Design a protein with these regions (language model features):
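Conserved alpha-helical "signature site"
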Residues: 1-178, 183-259
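C-terminal appended segment following the main domain
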Residues: 244-293
Length: 293
């Protein structure tokens, strides 16, 4: 007796083009991965780090279970960026030095850097996106200090401001796995440019990160349209601009105007501050990227 089961149409039969599939939103159900996820250990550490009552002992114990994460925390705690007076040799000391919010950020940066090493998924874009995210994160902290907004939140939205690009790259591979024709490089780049901020917001909602992190990501190219967190969106915007100025994970644009930008003026950026950063940025970038290598 023949089976009554009706075969599901191939992905490419239902959605002949990749961008049509992406526009449909069906990928959230039909994609093998659906959306970007955090490893279980990383999720546990982030939850702990968000707990105002968490102890150094708790964080150190959980963090020590991940050798890669522990090594990166120690490297960062001893880097020129943190400038410790003496060498930090234990995870407990690193947690104290960095602070619980920074530990959360290091966890996410480590996960991001590790994920982007996957050439099969992110191809030639991966390493550049990792370096750009980490560089922008530290620049966002520096800008936030001037703007007098939360620096640890600034690190986080600076780090993940292009997270939507990772999802777009992942979806290009998932469509092929489902039987579709591989999109061209031009098609991928066009969607990256047009929708990465929107897709980044979707990823952060899946991760249950608060609006103060999500909205600066969604509006980092148009901060004046951000109603709820306009200052944070402006910090993210300017940090991204500075990252492009210095070539952090991308081609450098040293002539990119900063002081003429009204957003920089509103944030309190001065010529003296920018000149100081111009001199320090390359060394700081090297120290933090070495920590996450």
């Amino acid at each position: 007796m023949p089976s009554s089961t009706v075969a599901k149409p191939k992905l490419a039969e239902k959605y002949p083009t990749w961008d049509g599939w992406v526009d449909s939103g069906e990928w959230a159900k039909t994609s093998p991965t659906g959306t970007l996820t955090l490893p279980a250990n990383a999720s546990e550490i982030m939850i702990l780090a968000l707990d105002p009552d968490v102890s150094v002992t708790q964080l150190a114990r959980v963090t020590s279970r991940d050798q890669v994460l522990a090594a990166r925390m120690l490297r960062l705690a001893n880097s020129a960026y943190c400038a410790p007076l003496q060498e930090i040799t234990t995870i407990s000391e690193a947690v104290v030095r960095l602070g619980t919010a920074s530990v959360r950020n290091v966890v996410l940066a480590t996960c991001m850097a590790s994920r982007l090493q996957s050439g099969n998924t992110y191809g030639v874009h991966g390493r550049g996106l990792a370096a750009h995210g980490i560089g922008t994160a530290f620049l966002a902290q520096l800008v936030a200090r001037v703007a007098i907004v939360n620096q640890e939140e600034a690190f986080l939205y600076g780090l993940v401001h292009d997270m939507g690009k990772l999802l777009v790259l992942q979806l290009s591979k998932d469509y092929v796995r489902g039987g579709g024709k591989a999109p061209t490089e031009d098609e991928v780049v066009a969607l990256l440019d047009a929708r990465h901020a929107e897709f980044g917001g979707r990823v952060l909602r899946e991760w249950h990160l608060p609006p103060v992190i999500e909205e600066p990501v969604v509006y980092h190219h148009r901060p004046d349209e951000c109603a709820s967190h306009p200052i944070e969106a402006s910090v993210c915007y300017l940090a991204d601009r500075l990252s492009h100025r210095y070539g952090f994970g991308c081609d450098a644009s040293p002539d990119l105007p900063i002081l003429d930008d009204p957003i920089a003026t509103r944030l309190g950026i001065t010529e003296a501050w920018l000149q100081d950063l111009d001199g320090r940025a390359p060394e700081l970038f090297k120290s933090v990227t070495d920590a996450f290598a």
